[in-house]
């Protein structure tokens, strides 16, 4: 998703 620094399960 737009956030690349968060874990993959947090990527929406």
UniProtKB/Swiss-Prot annotation:
One of its GO terms (cellular component) is extracellular region. Keywords: Amidation, G-protein coupled receptor impairing toxin, Neurotoxin, Secreted, Toxin. GO terms for molecular function: toxin activity. It is found in: Secreted. It comes from the Eukaryota. Expressed by the venom duct. The modification Phenylalanine amide is found at residue 12. Belongs to the FARP (FMRFamide related peptide) family. The mature peptide does not contain cysteine residue. This peptide activates mouse sensory neuron-specific G-protein coupled receptors MRGPRX1, but not human receptors. In vivo, causes hyperactivity in mice when injected intracranially. This is Conorfamide-Sr1. The lineage of its organism: Eukaryota, Metazoa, Spiralia, Lophotrochozoa, Mollusca.
């Amino acid at each position: 998703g737009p956030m690349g620094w968060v874990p993959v399960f947090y990527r929406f």
